[in-house]
């Protein structure tokens, strides 16, 4: 069967080839109904726009791709990423000017560790790697470009994944969805055991610290625009497990969700702020990710609230930064490097052939107790 081209899509959709190209590369310039029609027809015909269509024609590229949400792309203007610094080439730097110093608590270390595992496994197998990243404000063109150049693609999407033509890609190359629990596509789904992690946290808080009043903080709606908005389906899964396990233990779950105000930076953690102002904080805050926990602890400390003496805070992920902050963060450690390795192995096992049905793999997690809960 001949490879489907942009001309085939344009003819069936009744539009110009330029409109088809714009639908993938500049979707904001195409009417919603036209864009939806083009994407639907592309999916039906198995068309994948590519920056390297020759790779698809060859059938094999010897390269695997990984596409990740990078929260650094969400940082505001003037954060040191976009602007030239006048002292960048100076022999002497003013020690008081440190706004270009990297903030270890603000880096997507979860993504970094997964990427490292993916890279190591590809290196071990003699495969090349093509990486891509986007913020939530970006469209899907970079994903489809990468997909056309690789034999398989791992994705670490967050709240914007519904914008991606994933159903179309899943019919063309093998996909591994990292941190996604909703098995809608014929692809591999790779997650840590979120439910087990939450149970371990709750058990520790109840049995060791005698806590019976706790609440969850996390972007359960997906797609938060805050600086820590790296949350994915994992956070939704963790919240669901949290609420369910509170009920199983006979604890009040009516106030299980304290804060999901992650839609914009102006609204970020507004419910936590309100709880501080009204003096109605629970005994413990269980955060959906370590990065959310960092921001919560900063907010509490800046408000004169001691952690863990006044309020216990826990995270989830186990990134390195949790050991560098004060107090050290009690968290659930998930095997991030192993997630990357497994993603690469799963893609390698397919030899470029897409999955015919969903396949799921869940990796175990463990509790790490430190100072933010009063241990260690």
Residue map of PLM features:
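Active-site-adjacent beta->alpha loops and helix N-cap segments on the catalytic face
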Residues: 162-170
């Amino acid at each position: 069967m001949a490879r489907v081209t942009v001309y085939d899509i344009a003819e069936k959709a009744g539009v110009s080839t330029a409109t088809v190209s714009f639908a993938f590369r500049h979707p904001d310039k195409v009417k919603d109904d036209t864009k939806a029609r083009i994407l639907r027809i592309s999916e039906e015909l198995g068309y994948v726009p590519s920056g390297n269509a020759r790779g698809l024609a060859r059938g094999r590229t010897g390269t695997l791709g990984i596409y990740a949400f990078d929260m650094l792309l969400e940082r505001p203007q003037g954060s040191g990423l976009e602007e030239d610094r006048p002292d960048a080439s100076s022999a002497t730097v003013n020690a008081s000017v440190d706004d270009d110093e990297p903030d270890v608590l603000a880096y997507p270390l979860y993504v970094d560790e997964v990427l490292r595992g993916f890279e190591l496994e590809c290196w071990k197998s003699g495969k090349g790697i093509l990486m891509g990243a986007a913020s939530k404000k970006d469209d899907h063109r970079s994903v489809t470009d990468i997909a056309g150049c690789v034999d398989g693609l791992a994705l670490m999407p967050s709240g914007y994944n519904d914008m991606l033509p994933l159903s179309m890609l899943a019919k063309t190359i093998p996909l591994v969805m990292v941190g996604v629990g909703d098995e809608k596509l014929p692809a591999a789904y790779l997650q840590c055991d979120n439910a087990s992690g939450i149970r371990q946290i709750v058990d520790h808080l109840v049995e060791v610290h005698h806590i019976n009043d706790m609440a969850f903080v996390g972007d359960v709606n997906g797609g938060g625009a805050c600086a820590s908005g790296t949350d994915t389906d994992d956070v939704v899964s963790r919240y669901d497990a949290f609420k369910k396990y509170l009920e199983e233990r006979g604890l009040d779950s009516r106030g299980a969700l304290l804060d999901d105000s992650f839609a914009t930076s102006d609204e970020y953690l507004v419910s936590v702020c309100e709880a501080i102002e009204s003096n109605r904080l629970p005994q413990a805050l269980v955060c959906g990710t370590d990065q959310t926990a960092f921001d919560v602890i900063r907010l509490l400390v800046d408000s004169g609230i001691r952690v863990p003496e006044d309020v216990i805070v826990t995270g989830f992920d186990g990134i390195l930064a949790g050991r560098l902050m004060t107090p050290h963060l009690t968290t659930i450690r998930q095997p991030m490097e192993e997630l990357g390795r497994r993603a690469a192995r799963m893609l390698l096992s397919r030899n470029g052939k897409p999955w015919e049905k969903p396949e799921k793999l869940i990796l175990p997690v463990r509790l790490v107790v430190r100072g933010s809960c009063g241990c260690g």
